[in-house]
């Protein structure tokens, strides 16, 4: 019997060197062909995705057109806008590939609000860079309005926002209902729209999409969390002569490698932490970190990728 899987798409599944809408749609057609391999094997999919380049470009457009009569939209609204655009492209691409395969299934995109704690320490120390690069003078002028800017690796100054951890997903029950009715679901785009309180007030923040995907996998009681990235395996001693691929690894082993500093913050580390958190959430859970091209191996005797178990 197939598994209920949350599949978190990496940036390379959407964006190539061409940032046009057409190119991103074409990339998602190729991505959808890989996802359909899983659907053919009987798996039930909840697909999440990033939005970093897309929301960055949208913020540039908002800034360029900002005026009294046409004010720029806030970050939470921009995240919602990219959830809509990428969700539209992805659902369209999935429908194309399902039709080619002769599979009759519905696809639904869910605008997803992810609840964060207003007392999260991340709000005291914004670290996530967003938007365009500015000169120091431009950044200092912008900071007078209350924004926080930091110098970014010699490339200029960028606005930084908090990256709080998700504590709940408002639409989780809706997503689970769709899955129970065998509807392929796209949700938690860009880590979700960050909201706080019972009134679900949007806040200026960015939620890591791997942590949001993990929280979603917990809430819908998924069997597996599949995190896609640009490499086939998680490695220790990455880029060194003694580099080693991890195939089957336990949470305890991953924790040791993490403490030894094998995983880079902002790159592989959040994927590792999300995988550990999901596998520890309940018995018999599995996390897989691999590349898009290896999705077809998920039901084989040997999964190509790093399989994390308790």
UniProtKB/Swiss-Prot annotation:
Gene Ontology molecular function terms on file: ATP binding; carbamate kinase activity
Pfam families documented for this protein: AA_kinase
Plastid keyword on record: no
Keywords: Arginine metabolism, ATP-binding, Cytoplasm, Kinase, Nucleotide-binding, Transferase
Activity regulation as described: Inhibited by adenosine(5')pentaphospho(5')adenosine (Ap5A), Ap6A and to a much lower extent by Ap4A.
Main localization (coarse): cytoplasm
Listed result of changing residue 136 to A: No change in activity
This enzyme's EC code(s): 2.7.2.2
GO annotation, cellular component aspect: cytosol
UniProt pathway: Metabolic intermediate metabolism; carbamoyl phosphate degradation; CO(2) and NH(3) from carbamoyl phosphate: step 1/1
Stored PANTHER family: CARBAMATE KINASE, CARBAMATE KINASE-RELATED
Protein role: Catalyzes the reversible synthesis of carbamate and ATP from carbamoyl phosphate and ADP. Can also catalyze, although with low efficiency, the phosphorylation of bicarbonate, leading to the formation of carboxyphosphate, an unstable intermediate found in the reactions catalyzed by carbamoyl-phosphate synthase and biotin carboxylase. Can also use acetate.
Localization (cell): Cytoplasm
Superkingdom field: Bacteria
GO biological process: arginine deiminase pathway
Induction pattern: By arginine.
Protein's name according to its UniProt entry: Carbamate kinase 1
Self-association and partners: Homodimer (predominantly) and homotetramer.
Family, as annotated: Belongs to the carbamate kinase family.
Presence of the UniProt keyword ATP-binding in the record: yes
Reactions performed catalytically: hydrogencarbonate + NH4(+) + ATP = carbamoyl phosphate + ADP + H2O + H(+)
Enzyme's top EC category: transferase
């Amino acid at each position: 019997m197939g598994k209920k899987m949350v599949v978190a798409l990496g940036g390379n599944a959407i964006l190539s060197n061409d940032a046009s809408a057409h190119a991103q749609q074409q990339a998602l057609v190729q991505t959808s062909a890989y996802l359909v391999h899983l659907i053919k094997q009987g798996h039930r999919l909840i697909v999440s995705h990033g939005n970093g380049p897309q929301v960055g470009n949208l913020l540039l457009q908002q800034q360029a057109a900002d005026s009294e009569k046409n004010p720029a939209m806030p970050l939470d609204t921009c995240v919602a806008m990219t959830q809509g655009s990428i969700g539209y492209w992805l659902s369209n691409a999935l429908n194309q590939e399902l039709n080619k395969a002769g599979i009759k299934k519905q696809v639904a995109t869910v605008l997803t609000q992810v609840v964060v704690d207003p007392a999260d320490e991340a709000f005291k120390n914004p670290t996530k860079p967003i938007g365009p690069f500015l000169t120091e003078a431009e950044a200092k002028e912008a900071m007078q309005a209350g924004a926080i800017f930091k110098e970014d690796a010699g490339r200029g100054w960028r606005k930084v926002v908090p990256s709080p951890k998700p504590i709940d997903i408002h639409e989780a029950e809706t997503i689970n209902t769709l899955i129970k009715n065998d509807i392929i679901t796209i949700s938690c785009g860009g880590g979700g729209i960050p909201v706080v309180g019972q009134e679900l007030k949007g806040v200026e923040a960015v939620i890591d999409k791997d942590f949001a995907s993990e929280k979603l996998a917990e809430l819908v009681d998924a069997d597996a969390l599949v995190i896609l990235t640009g490499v086939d395996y998680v490695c220790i001693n990455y880029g060194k002569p003694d580099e080693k691929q991890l195939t089957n690894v336990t949470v305890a082993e991953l924790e040791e490698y993490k403490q030894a500093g094998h995983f880079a913050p902002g790159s592989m580390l959040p994927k590792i932490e999300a995988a550990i958190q999901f596998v520890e959430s309940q018995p018999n859970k599995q996390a897989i970190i691999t590349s898009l091209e290896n999705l077809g191996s998920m039901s084989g005797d040997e999964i190509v990728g790093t399989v994390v178990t308790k």
